[in-house]
């Protein structure tokens, strides 16, 4: 799930790597909060258009996109003659996202909300990778994350701020200790900015990207999928420090 103003092409480095290791990588694009929001706008109006798209309505629509895509994939998997027919294992679905896409992933993967309960969670998602996580701006953070039942891997950086929104590097790191214990992991990349998890630098970056960040993201994310989607004991032992 891409970030605000992004597209399904924004993290090809992840998709290519995971696909090369046997995973079917499906990239969502969320109408209403994707690149179409700003592309045709004059430069002076682009930030305002992006802020407008960072709405509660789009947040809900994004979360609703996920089950719709999973339903369609299941249909294609059982459709004779389709190129994906029989190639998908619906029992082993993982979800990942960055920034607004990370927020979307949180919603689908077990975050609770004061008014909405757990109504956005999709039980088909068995593991989640959240890049640039978001702490709730209101309410009890422990109530939000204390009942997450599936494995989560959080990734952020010590300079992980975004041009839109109130999240800080410190608020992003508040999510991990609030998660229910068991099969939860966090990677904090030193000096990594918000763009560390994207295909290319973002406007407003303050420093050169560290190529080792992508290497760490790829290695850890793949080990996480292997551990919890393939039940690979060696990968899980490596993640937990026992291997």
Residue locations for each model-derived region?
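Short substrate-entry loop that stabilizes the transition state in hydrolases
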Residues: 1-38, 137-138, 161-165
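Catalytic nucleophile serine of serine hydrolases
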Residues: 3, 99, 132
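Alpha/beta-hydrolase active-site loop
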Residues: 41-90, 107
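Active-site rim elements
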Residues: 52-57, 139-141, 204-215
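Residue in the alpha/beta-hydrolase core beta-strand immediately N-terminal to the catalytic nucleophile
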Residues: 92-94, 129
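Gly/Ala-rich beta-loop-alpha elbow adjacent to hydrolase catalytic centers
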Residues: 97-101, 105
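The feature captures the conserved acid-bearing segment of alpha/beta-hydrolase catalytic domains
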Residues: 117-191
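Alpha/beta-hydrolase-fold serine-hydrolase catalytic core, especially in secreted/extracellular enzymes
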Residues: 190-243
């Amino acid at each position: 799930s891409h970030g605000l103003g992004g597209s399904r092409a924004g993290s090809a480095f992840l998709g290519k790597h995971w696909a090369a290791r046997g995973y079917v990588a499906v990239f969502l694009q969320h109408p209403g909060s994707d690149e179409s929001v700003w592309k045709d706008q004059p430069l002076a109006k682009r930030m305002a258009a992006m802020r407008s798209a960072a709405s509660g309505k789009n947040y809900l629509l994004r979360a609703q996109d996920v089950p719709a895509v999973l339903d369609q994939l299941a249909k294609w998997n059982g459709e004779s003659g389709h190129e994906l027919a029989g190639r998908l294992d619906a029992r082993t679905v993982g979800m990942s996202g960055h920034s607004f896409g990370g927020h979307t992933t949180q919603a689908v993967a077990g975050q609770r909300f004061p008014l909405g309960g757990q109504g956005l969670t999709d039980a088909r998602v068995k593991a989640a990778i959240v890049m640039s996580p978001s702490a709730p701006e209101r309410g009890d953070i422990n109530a939000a994350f204390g009942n997450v039942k599936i494995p989560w891997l959080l990734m952020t950086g010590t300079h992980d701020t975004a041009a839109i929104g109130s999240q800080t590097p410190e608020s992003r790191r508040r999510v991990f200790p609030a998660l229910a214990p068991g099969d939860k992991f966090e990677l904090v990349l030193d000096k990594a900015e918000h763009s560390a998890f994207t295909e290319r630098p973002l406007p407003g970056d303050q420093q050169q990207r560290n190529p080792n960040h992508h290497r760490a993201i790829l290695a850890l994310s793949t080990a996480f999928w292997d551990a919890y989607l393939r039940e690979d004991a060696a990968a899980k032992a490596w993640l937990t420090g026992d291997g």
